[in-house]
């Protein structure tokens, strides 16, 4: 499933990029085929993912540790399901 996550955060984009890469290396690769993180500005990004297990991805991003990171970094997101236009 092609997914877009529009995120805002209080940390720097560099810190957020590292967080996403670390998550993908440790856990996310089980649920995401590939991803592309795009910097909108220092505190906003667009993350495009090819999610192969939506339930697993949702569970992995909803752990107490992830929620604590979200809170500490002022993280907020809006998720969209993407479909190709023919």
Feature map (PLM): residue ranges:
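Short S/T/G/P-rich N-terminal loop/turn motif that feeds into the first structured element of a domain
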Residues: 1-69, 76-86
């Amino acid at each position: 499933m092609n997914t877009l996550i529009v995120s805002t955060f209080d940390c720097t984009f560099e810190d957020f990029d590292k967080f996403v890469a670390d998550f993908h290396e440790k856990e996310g690769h089980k649920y995401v085929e590939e991803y592309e993180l795009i910097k909108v500005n220092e505190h906003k990004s667009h993350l495009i993912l090819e999610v192969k297990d939506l339930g697993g991805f949702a569970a992995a991003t909803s752990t107490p540790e992830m929620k604590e990171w979200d809170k500490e970094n002022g993280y907020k997101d809006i998720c969209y399901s993407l479909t190709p236009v023919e």
